[in-house]
From Swiss-Prot:
GO terms for biological process: asymmetric cell division; cytokinesis by cell plate formation; DNA endoreduplication; embryo development ending in seed dormancy; gametophyte development; guard mother cell cytokinesis; guard mother cell differentiation; meiotic cytokinesis. This is Cyclin-dependent kinase A-1. It is found in: Cytoplasm; Nucleus. Changing D146N: Decreased kinase activity and disturbed cell cycle. Reduced frequency of cell division during embryo development. Altered stomatal production. Interacts with SPCH. Induction: By nematode infection in roots. Down-regulated by salt stress in root meristem and replication blocking agents (hydroxyurea and aphidicolin). It catalyses: L-seryl-[protein] + ATP = O-phospho-L-seryl-[protein] + ADP + H(+); L-threonyl-[protein] + ATP = O-phospho-L-threonyl-[protein] + ADP + H(+); [DNA-directed RNA polymerase] + ATP = phospho-[DNA-directed RNA polymerase] + ADP + H(+). Involved in the control of the cell cycle. Essential for both G1/S and G2/M (mitosis) phase transitions. Functions in cell morphogenesis as well as cell proliferation. Required for cell division (entry into mitosis) of the generative cell in male gametogenesis. Required to trigger guard mother cells (GMC) symmetric divisions at the late stage of stomatal development, probably via the regulation of G1 to S transition in the cell cycle. Required for the function of SPCH in entering the stomatal lineage. One of its GO terms (cellular component) is cortical microtubule, transverse to long axis. Phosphorylated at Tyr-15 by WEE1. Phosphorylation at Thr-161 is important for the kinase activity and substrate binding. Binding to the anti-phosphatase PAS2 prevents dephosphorylation. Interacts with CDT1A, CYCA2-3, CYCD2-1, CYCD3-1, CYCD4-1, CYCD4-2, CYCH1-1, CYCU1-1, CYCU2-1, CYCU2-2, CYCU3-1, CYCU4-1, CYCU4-2, CYCU4-3, CKS1, KRP2/ICK2, KRP3/ICK6, KRP4/ICK7, KRP6/ICK4, KRP7/ICK5, and C-terminal domain of KRP1/ICK1. Interacts with WEE1 and TIF4A-1/EIF4A-1. Interacts with PAS2; when phosphorylated at Tyr-15. Interacts with SMR3, SMR4, SMR5, SMR6, SMR8 and At4g14310. Binds to CYCD3-2. Component of a DREAM-like complex which modulates a variety of developmentally regulated genes and of the mitotic genes in proliferating and differentiated cells. The lineage of its organism: Eukaryota, Viridiplantae, Streptophyta, Embryophyta, Tracheophyta. Gene3D superfamilies: Phosphorylase Kinase, domain 1, Transferase(Phosphotransferase) domain 1.
């Protein structure tokens, strides 16, 4: 750890404290994540180290670069490139955020590019939310943070400071207890983030797992076998769920054009096997005026 000097604590993430730090060798500013593991006394599981080492290979302009992994005194430190703004802070501090439809489109495109890259490397995120989408103010580029960490460390119910980990962006198949979920879980999260950028408020702000499910059902309709094959066999599905009819998504994103509504509805299909994938989403008509961003 001698190579890095902590400058200040900048936050408390899902897995531990995040510091702004300086690389003493290159003088570069970096973000240092100290991973707090459940079994402190046992040190770092070798599976976690293997998973994390694979992430160092991931290189893409829309992914926050994992520069180094330091295993020191039973602690794991992850060294990332430093970005000081996330999408949540940006939305909260920009009253007219939802009016800049072109910027929202470029952000969504970049999110999908990062996800398509990760999915092509068989890496899921599982915990996408505005807080882990980082923005480089100089270039207005957006980068996904914390990709692959859920597989290495699991997703806790609460952070180490006892904050509840948000459920607002969690896909229905996870909430219903599926153990065989895959890349569509990230697309669901992106749909929720897209809707939030457009309306500047969360689409499904649940405060418990059942409340989260019911908030989804009230808008998207309660799923049943005809609309989602196999749903009634999922561990947490109950035949006693209230039967809500689907509503019109447009009413929640009134300033989104028809192409945008079409893309959003394809991302928020309840049945994960029917949900659009990241590559297909990038080819959607909604992005045609971007002229294939670099």
């Amino acid at each position: 750890m001698d190579q890095y000097e902590k400058v200040e604590k900048i936050g408390e993430g899902t897995y531990g404290v995040v510091y702004k730090a300086r690389d003493k060798v290159t003088n570069e500013t970096i973000a240092l994540k100290k991973i707090r593991l459940e079994q402190e006394d046992e040190g770092v599981p070798s599976t976690a180290i293997r998973e994390i080492s694979l992430l160092k290979e991931m290189q893409h302009s829309n992914i926050v670069k994992l520069q180094d992994v330091v295993h020191s005194e039973k602690r794991l430190y992850l060294v990332f490139e430093y970005l000081d703004l996330d999408l949540k802070k940006h939305m909260d501090s920009t009253p007219d955020f939802s009016k800049d439809l072109h910027m929202i489109k470029t952000y969504l495109y970049q999110i999908l590019r990062g996800i398509a890259y990760c999915h092509s490397h068989r890496v899921l995120h599982r915990d996408l939310k505005p807080q882990n989408l980082l923005i480089d103010r100089r270039t207005n580029s957006l980068k996904l943070a914390d990709f692959g960490l859920a597989r290495a460390f699991g997703i806790p119910v609460r952070t180490f400071t006892h904050e509840v980990v948000t459920l607002w962006y969690r896909a229905p198949e996870i909430l219903l207890g599926s153990h065989h979920y895959s890349t569509p879980v990230d697309i669901w999260s992106v749909g929720c983030i897209f809707a939030e950028m457009i309306s500047q408020k969360p689409l499904f702000p649940g405060d418990s797992e059942i409340d989260q499910l019911f908030k989804i059902f009230r808008i998207m309709g309660t799923p049943y076998e005809d609309t989602w094959r196999g749903v009634t066999s999922l561990p947490d599905y109950k035949s006693a769920f209230p039967k809500w009819k689907p509503t019109d998504l447009e009413t929640f994103v009134p300033n989104l054009d028809p192409d945008g509504v079409d893309l959003l509805s394809k991302m928020l299909l309840m049945d994960p096997t029917k949900r659009i994938n990241a590559r297909a989403a990038l080819e959607h008509e909604y992005f045609k005026d971007l002229g294939g961003m670099p």
